[in-house]
Design a protein with these regions (language model features):
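Post-signal peptide N-terminal segment of mature Sec-exported envelope proteins
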Residues: 31-54
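Mature, soluble, non-transmembrane domains
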Residues: 73-241
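Bacterial N-terminal signal peptides that target proteins for export
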Residues: 1-11
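C-terminal motif of bacterial Sec signal peptides marking the signal peptidase cleavage site
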Residues: 19-22
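N-terminal, post-signal-peptide region of Sec/Tat-exported proteins
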Residues: 53-76
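Bacterial signal peptide processing site
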Residues: 24-26
Length: 241
């Protein structure tokens, strides 16, 4: 299952948190229903931006370590930007923006093939693809380049500034999508992972967002564990009829 929260109560969540070091990394990515439909129909990528928040020991550490993280993790097609550091609680909070894309890919691919086709050597992307045997469902998946992110993490941990910061690489993280329905029809989603060809969940499992409405979907611990193993997960499935 995938946990659902309102916008006011949700934690920030989204992509690329695996490579940063700290106590807690939260990311949040807004995606519009019209963008999902446009990508599925035209195949033209749509830019999306993930807001990332990380905890640091102090504000100066945040600036130093955040700058190193940006230099280590960014790629030309998926740049990471440090947008601010401020005192928060017993430490400091760093805010980042990661620019990536929502693209279209084919369904029914093996894990290795779909990761290669979606990521194309970059760190993180979202993708829309047909959902197996359920022709009226569009899957929205999150894809991470785990080897690249893990290598970046090890490189960061070896830097003197990170060693002085006292980090051991242990990180808690969360992933959230803010779904914004900017169409004139209700948008309906299955939040449970519907296996290809498997039975659809009951109607009670459907998230309905009215025209002009919005809601938030957060990966639960089980789904995050799968993401950390396979490199991608089906975040949600959108009904097209």
């Amino acid at each position: 299952m995938i946990a659902r929260r309102t916008l006011l109560a949700s934690l920030a969540a989204g992509i690329a948190a695996l490579a940063l070091t700290g106590c807690q990394i939260d990311t949040r990515t807004p995606i519009r229903v019209s963008e999902i439909l446009s990508v599925a129909q035209s195949g033209a990528p749509v830019p999306v931006s993930a807001a990332i928040t990380g905890q640091f020991v102090t504000e100066p550490w945040c600036k130093d370590e955040g700058t190193m993280a940006v230099e280590t993790i960014s790629t030309p097609n998926v740049p990471l930007q440090l947008t601010g550091c401020a005192a928060a609680g017993n430490g400091a909070a760093g805010t980042f923006q990661l620019a990536t894309n929502l693209i279209r890919t084919d369904g029914g691919q093996s894990d290795d093939v779909i990761l290669t086709n979606v990521l194309e050597g970059d760190t993180a992307r979202f993708a829309v693809f047909p959902h197996g045997k359920h022709k009226d469902l569009l899957s929205v998946g999150l894809f991470l380049n785990l080897p690249q992110l893990q290598a970046a993490q090890q490189k960061l941990l070896a830097m003197p500034v990170f060693k002085r910061g006292g980090y051991d690489g242990t990180t808690n993280f969360s992933f959230t999508i803010d779904i914004l329905n900017d169409t004139d029809k209700p948008a309906k989603f299955y939040l449970a992972d519907v296996s290809a060809g498997g039975d659809l969940p009951s109607d009670e499992a459907i998230l309905t967002i009215p025209p002009g409405g919005q809601d938030t979907v957060t990966l639960d611990a089980q789904t995050q564990a799968k993401l950390g193993t396979t490199g991608w997960v089906n975040f949600m499935s959108m009904m097209t009829k």
